[in-house]
C-alpha cells in the first residue's frame, strides 16, 4: 500500500491484525507512516527501528510488515514476516549505480539477492 506526502514516499506490504497504535491517517499505510515520523528525532533509521518494534509489540499478529520509505535522499527498508517467505521475502539488486528493491525478482535476472527476515537497512 503506497502513500506519499510533500516530504516522502512510503510503501507498506504486509498484513497486521489487531494493531493498537494511536496515529492519524485515512489508510493503514498513512497511520504507520505518521507513527514512524513521530519517532523521528533526527535519525530516520532509528525512528523506523523504534516504530517497527513498538508496532510489533502492539499488534495481535504480524503476518508481514515490509516497509520502504524515502525522502529523495535517504531510503530505508524494514522487512519482517511470520509466515510464507516465498511470498513476503523481499529482494535487492545493484545495477547501473542504483539499488533496486522489490517483492519478487524480475524474470530472467539472476543477480537478485534475498533480503533476510527481520532486516532493517539504509539503502545506498
Residue ranges, per PLM feature:
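Conserved short alpha-helical segments that host acidic/polar catalytic motifs at enzyme active sites
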Residues: 1-124
Amino acid at each position: 500500500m503506497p502513500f506519499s506526502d510533500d516530504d516522502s514516499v512510503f510503501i507498506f506490504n504486509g498484513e497486521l491484525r489487531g494493531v493498537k497504535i494511536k496515529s492519524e491517517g485515512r489508510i493503514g499505510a498513512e497511520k504507520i507512516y505518521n507513527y514512524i515520523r513521530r519517532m523521528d528525532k533526527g535519525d530516520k533509521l532509528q525512528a523506523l527501528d523504534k516504530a517497527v518494534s513498538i508496532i510489533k509489540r502492539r499488534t495481535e499478529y504480524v503476518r508481514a510488515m515490509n516497509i520502504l520509505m524515502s525522502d529523495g535522499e535517504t531510503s530505508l527498508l524494514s522487512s519482517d514476516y511470520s509466515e510464507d517467505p516465498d511470498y513476503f521475502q523481499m529482494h535487492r539488486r545493484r545495477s547501473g549505480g542504483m539499488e533496486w528493491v522489490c517483492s519478487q525478482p524480475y524474470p530472467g535476472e539472476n543477480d537478485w539477492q534475498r533480503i533476510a527476515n527481520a532486516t532493517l537497512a539504509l539503502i545506498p
